Amino acid sequence: MNISSPAMYTEKEASSKRYKYAACIILILIIITYSLFILKKDALHVDEVLSFVISTYNSYGFKKNFNEGIIYTSSALKNDMFGYDNSIHDILDDIISLRKNNRDSPHTNFYYSLLRVSFIGSHFSGIDTIMLRAGILNICISIITFIFLYRLSLIIFTTDIARITCLILAFFSPAAISTVLFYRPYQLQTLFFYYQYFFILHNNK
């Protein structure tokens, strides 16, 4: 059969549609799975605490110590460490401060700035508030990551089975789920890796 014949073109087009439908189903399952895990999360790792303290540019919990002569309530401790003002002016001030010095030299300020923006429209009423916002942010980053890997799989693999397997392994592995649940810049790092890889291959294919 001639590879340019209508029959071959129709077969290839049908295969592409199957992959698109499968990818949509996988993405929906990813969002549901990640959301369920995030809703079940009830504690923070010490590094995650650092993410929130840095993003809101608070001093307590970072360089400023609590007064040893004062007995604090748990609510007061949480408010001093995680409290924030949700006004646009204060958010911009924090982002500018993060740009000048994010106080975490191994990482850029980008994730912390996104985390700060994610608090728009909310008031600190407990750790659950910021955990939920951070979880939604990581899910949004995962969706963008999924789009780039979807496009990347079209370049790397030639069969739908290989592409679907790639998406499943990349987003349903224990490591992938753990990264989404860990509120640090690593999910954003994964996104940039796929973006860079896609950009290189897309421009050299």
Per-region residue spans from a language model:
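Hydrophobic alpha-helical transmembrane segments
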Residues: 21-25, 113, 136, 164-168
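Membrane-interfacial, low-structure loops and terminal tails that flank and connect transmembrane helices
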Residues: 1-16
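Specific aromatic-rich, kink-prone transmembrane helix
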Residues: 117, 148, 168, 172, ...
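Short acidic/glycine- and proline-prone juxtamembrane loop motifs at membrane-interface regions
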Residues: 181-186
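Transmembrane signal-anchor helices characteristic of membrane glycosylation enzymes that use polyprenol
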Residues: 18-86
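Interfacial juxtamembrane loops and adjacent helix segments
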Residues: 56-107, 115-131
